Regions:
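PLP-dependent enzyme catalytic core of the Aspartate aminotransferase-like
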Residues: 8, 25-28, 358, 367-400
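N-terminal "arm"/small-domain region of PLP-dependent enzymes with the aminotransferase-like
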Residues: 12-71
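Active-site C-terminal subdomain of aminotransferase-like
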Residues: 39, 228-311, 324, 400
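Conserved N-terminal alpha-helix of the aminotransferase class I/II PLP-enzyme fold
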Residues: 58-112, 119, 134, 142
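Conserved PLP-anchoring active-site segment centered on the Schiff-base-forming lysine
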Residues: 121-137
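Active-site phosphate-binding strand-loop segment of PLP-dependent enzymes
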Residues: 143, 154-211
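Conserved active-site segment immediately N-terminal to the catalytic lysine
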Residues: 204, 218-229, 238
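Conserved PLP-binding catalytic core of the aspartate aminotransferase-like
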Residues: 319-355
Length: 400
């Protein structure tokens, strides 16, 4: 049962392709938080590149180069076309401004927690963070190991069920930078818009789990990073973008050469051997996004999918959404069983998950810090899968 978003046929309707279920079925509806679902067209084109990479960055219909993407040198002209094309698409499709350098690094967002703190911290200045959950806490912990770190806002008191009010400028006025996590995968919260830091303090964003899900004011951030394995591609690639003037700044302390952003900018994402296959898949995903109508078209479908699921939760007598109105993520919908004593809630949750898995809904178990359930409905997740889940939830409730 189930399926993914259809490939964009030549000359076909982009919006229709976003809404349709692929003719190539999947055994399960994949609600995994990541690595996550990818478009069927990307699978097919990536498989073709494993057999033989095509010229011009694996352009459709281009001549083969005689080698697989898995074996070709990262210093070769064919691969340079891949990485350059991916970089240009990050500007074109995602809206990363030309004032910022795009990098494709490894180590995931977890490595960026440390790298950004090493590179962006200025001597004698603290770093400021907004705490919205597990991943911001991990970033804070890395910063604390390097110097004074301020937590200038937090929603911990309500178990991260909302985005806290943006901190007053005075609270971070003397900081090297202000860091926020713009979508919180575990708790299902999201900034409605990228905020504007004041006083010239650089804004740093971890936008891993909603990168490419809608138009965003990415120019407001001096530095941003996103693990690819949500909306942008497979695991093993991290998209980083950094305002070019920051590359010239001297860090507060010694930073190993390979951990300097300036190192990777000087030899654009080629200082050491990159994840060549991962960068190619990221490029193919960005091409799929562009051909599907770009971020406005993708955002419209994502909004519709999330609205259907939240409406079902708000109408339910059995389930309750974790995230508060105004802070709800369009990518990661979290909810729990409602009302009953804890033991009964846990029993009901186990019953729901067991029946959901048997019905073909995979990856719905929530993180232990929230409990209950989580449905990750990234760009490539089909609207039909949300419709099927809503119907299943209603039927489950009717049978109680």
């Amino acid at each position: 049962m189930g399926g993914n978003l259809g490939a964009v046929a030549a000359g076909g309707s982009a919006l229709a392709s976003l809404a349709m279920v692929s003719a190539k079925p999947a055994k399960l509806w994949n609600f995994s938080a990541g690595p996550a679902i990818l478009p069927p067209e990307v699978f097919e084109r990536a498989a073709d590149a494993v057999h033989e990479l095509r010229a011009e960055g694996h352009a459709r219909g281009a001549k083969g180069v005689g080698m697989s993407i898995l074996e070709i040198s990262h210093r070769s002209k064919p691969y340079e076309a891949v990485t350059f094309g991916a970089e240009q698409l990050c500007h074109e499709v995602l809206g990363i401004p030309e004032t910022h350098q795009v990098l494709f690094l490894q180590g995931g967002a977890s490595l960026q927690f440390a790298m950004l703190a090493m590179n962006l911290r200025e001597a004698g200045k603290p770093a400021a963070y907004v705490d919205t959950g597990v991943w911001s806490q991990k970033a804070i912990a890395e910063s604390q190991g390097l110097g004074e770190t301020l937590t200038v806002a937090s929603s911990a008191a309500t178990n991260y069920d909302r985005i806290p009010a943006f901190p007053d400028a005075a609270s971070y006025a003397h900081a090297s930078y202000l860091h926020i996590t713009t979508n919180n995968t575990i708790f299902g919260t999201e900034y409605a818009e990228i905020p504007q830091a004041e006083g010239g303090v650089p804004l740093v964003i971890d936008f891993s789990s909603h990168a490419g899900s809608r138009p965003m004011a990415l120019e407001r951030a001096a530095f941003g990073y996103a693990g690819a394995q949500k909306n942008l591609g497979p695991s093993g690639v991290t998209l980083v973008y950094i305002r070019k003037d920051l590359l010239a700044k001297k860090p507060a302390a010694h930073v190993p050469v390979i951990l300097r952003y300036a190192t990777h900018a000087k030899e654009p994402s080629l200082y050491n051997t990159p994840n060549t296959f991962g960068v190619l898949v990221l490029k193919l995903v960005l091409e799929w996004m562009r051909d599907a109508g770009g971020l406005p078209a993708i955002a419209a479908v994502n909004e519709r999918k999330a609205s259907k699921l939240y409406a079902a939760l708000d109408a339910s007598q059995v389930f309750r959404a974790h995230a508060q109105l105004g802070s709800r993520s369009r990518m990661n919908v979290t909810w729990t069983a409602n009302g009953a004593p804890e033991a009964e809630r846990e029993a009901l949750s186990e019953r729901f998950l067991k029946q959901a898995q048997a019905a073909g809904f995979d990856g719905l178990k929530g993180h232990r810090l929230v409990g209950g359930f989580r449905a990750s409905i990234y760009n490539a997740f089909p609207e039909a899968g949300v419709d099927a889940l809503v119907e299943f939830m209603a039927e489950f409730e009717r049978r109680l």
